[in-house]
């Protein structure tokens, strides 16, 4: 090339030319702290890379959407119209017991193991001991309900008589007036009326036994006598005590008969004696069928000798009677027999020796 290439401009000069072309306002921009030695930097030496930008903030974790069909806790089966009265220990070996008491007239509550029956006074505490072999799940409860024992009354609801219902008889104020069974000393007791059967029940939370004890005691009160008109009216009742899980499912069941009376010890003694007299048969005593007895044979007539048979002859007239009597005596004397004894009410002339003592018979002498 003929023409010589123009020498390249220094980078500094190029920058200064460009800087002078900027408006004055741009030249007043603040410079970095190391602006005094910026020219000493090599044009080919790269500056420090800028710090990486901070990572974007992570989005907040959104709450998991609720499931479409959340699991529901198990529910209790609907209450049957005729509840079962069969004992059922279940997987937890559910049992009940009672405090040992005699048959004294002063006792307020006594239990008969022979009859499986509780005798108690009106509105007096009846301690029931609850035992389990395996601890039930937390949240379990005990439910008590009364039903009539006989089949013709089992569909009816056991309730108090109108008299005791008006009288009330409860200091806690939690139990409805018509409920027969109440719990004493437990503020957690809840009283229910079944929507289907209209039966009354009381529920208390299950509490494990204390240290050194093998049972939990619940105090039940029965608020009406068994003989009250308009209430139980002498109809026997059963108390069904059930152990229920947190969802109301049945875990165990125990039943016992209850009689509310004025003298529990006396009534227990009488009923146990009657039970033994019936031969220990449970429930209603059935009379044992006696073997058929043969009809008694009619008594056989004894065949007598005609000569020894006695006959009776009716005679009219005293004279004729005396004459026939003398003939009869003469015949007996001829046969070597004794004369017949005179009958009472008839005066007969006695002939013979006079008695040795006492009054002597006066005989008329023959002149």
Curated annotation (Swiss-Prot):
GO biological process, one term: positive regulation of transcription by RNA polymerase II
Region (Basic (repression of DNA-binding)): 347-364
Cytoplasm is among the record's keywords: yes
GO cellular component, one term: nucleus
Compartments, record wording: Cytoplasm; Nucleus
Predominant localisation class: cytoplasm
Cofactor annotation remark: Binds 1 zinc ion per subunit.
Domain of life of the native organism: Eukaryota
Span(s) of short sequence motif Nuclear export signal: 322-333
DNA-binding region: 87-278
Oligomer status and interactors: Binds DNA as a homotetramer.
Domain description: The N-terminal and C-terminal disordered regions undergo liquid-liquid phase separation (LLPS) following homotetramerization and activation. Post-translational modifications, such as phosphorylation or lactylation affect the ability to undergo LLPS. The nuclear export signal acts as a transcriptional repression domain. The TADI and TADII motifs (residues 17 to 25 and 48 to 56) correspond both to 9aaTAD motifs which are transactivation domains present in a large number of yeast and animal transcription factors.
Protein known as: Cellular tumor antigen p53
Source species of the chain: Gallus gallus
């Amino acid at each position: 090339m003929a023409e010589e290439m123009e020498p390249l401009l220094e980078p500094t000069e190029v920058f200064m030319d460009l800087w002078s072309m900027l408006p004055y306002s741009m030249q007043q921009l603040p410079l970095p702290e190391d602006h005094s030695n910026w020219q000493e930097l090599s044009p080919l030496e790269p500056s420090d890379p800028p710090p990486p930008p901070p990572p974007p903030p992570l989005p907040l974790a959104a709450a998991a959407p609720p499931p479409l069909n959340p699991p529901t806790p198990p529910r209790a089966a609907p209450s049957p119209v005729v509840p079962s009265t069969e004992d059922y220990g279940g997987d937890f070996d559910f049992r009940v017991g009672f405090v040992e008491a005699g048959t004294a007239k002063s006792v307020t509550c006594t239990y008969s193991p022979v009859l499986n029956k509780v005798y108690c006074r009106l509105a007096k505490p009846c301690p029931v001991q609850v035992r389990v072999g395996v601890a039930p799940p937390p949240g379990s409860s005990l439910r008590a309900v009364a039903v009539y024992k006989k089949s013709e009354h089992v569909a009816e609801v056991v309730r108090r008589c109108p008299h005791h219902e008006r009288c009330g008889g409860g200091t806690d104020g939690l139990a409805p007036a018509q409920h027969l069974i109440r719990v004493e000393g437990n503020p957690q007791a809840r009283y229910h009326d079944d929507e289907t059967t209209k039966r009354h029940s009381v529920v208390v939370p299950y509490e494990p036994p204390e240290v050194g004890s093998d049972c939990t005691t619940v105090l039940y009160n029965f608020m009406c006598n068994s003989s009250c008109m308009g209430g139980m009216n002498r109809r026997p009742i059963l108390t069904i005590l059930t152990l229920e899980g947190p969802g109301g499912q049945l875990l165990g069941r125990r039943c016992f008969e209850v009689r509310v009376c004025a003298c529990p010890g006396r009534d227990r003694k009488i009923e146990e004696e009657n039970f033994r007299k019936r031969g220990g048969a449970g429930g209603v005593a059935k009379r044992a069928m006696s073997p058929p007895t043969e009809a008694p044979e009619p008594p056989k007539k004894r065949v007598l000798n005609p000569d020894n048979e006695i006959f009776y002859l009716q005679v009219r007239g005293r004279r004729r009677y005396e004459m026939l009597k003398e003939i009869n005596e003469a015949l007996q004397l001829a046969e070597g027999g004794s004369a017949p004894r005179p009958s009472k009410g008839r005066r007969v002339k006695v002939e013979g020796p006079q008695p040795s003592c006492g009054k002597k018979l006066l005989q008329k002498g023959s002149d």
